[in-house]
Amino acid sequence: MSDYIKMWRKEHAQILEVLLQVLQLDIFSRVGQTKLQELKRSLEAHLKSEDLGFFPVLKKAAETDTDLRRELFLFAADMDKIAAETRAFFRKVENDSMGKDIPAEFRRISAMIKSRIFREENLLMKEYEKVTSRK
């Protein structure tokens, strides 16, 4: 397993841990709010890392692999939706951190993020390892 994949898995594990912590805490508490901000920073850093180190490798391989190209297209559309909804959630928290729908919204985006991480690790990570092992 490459160092990048190890780092990527570690970032995923950290994101999942913070998601769990927020779900277990009172989201309206000081600690809950602090964890939400930690989650926001972790997600932003992880997405930047993916954009710089992960997806360029897969996109290059997809130039000659139509199945991978199709898979990346679907993942990109899914990520656009998740990113938009996650940004909207964090804007909502910034504007009304005590909004009554915040807990339900957080559970919803948490499920989306967890599902995305699971799919990335079980599909895209394998593709990445195949592509990088050919080099």
Regions from the PLM with identified roles:
Residues 1-135:
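Small-residue-biased structural context
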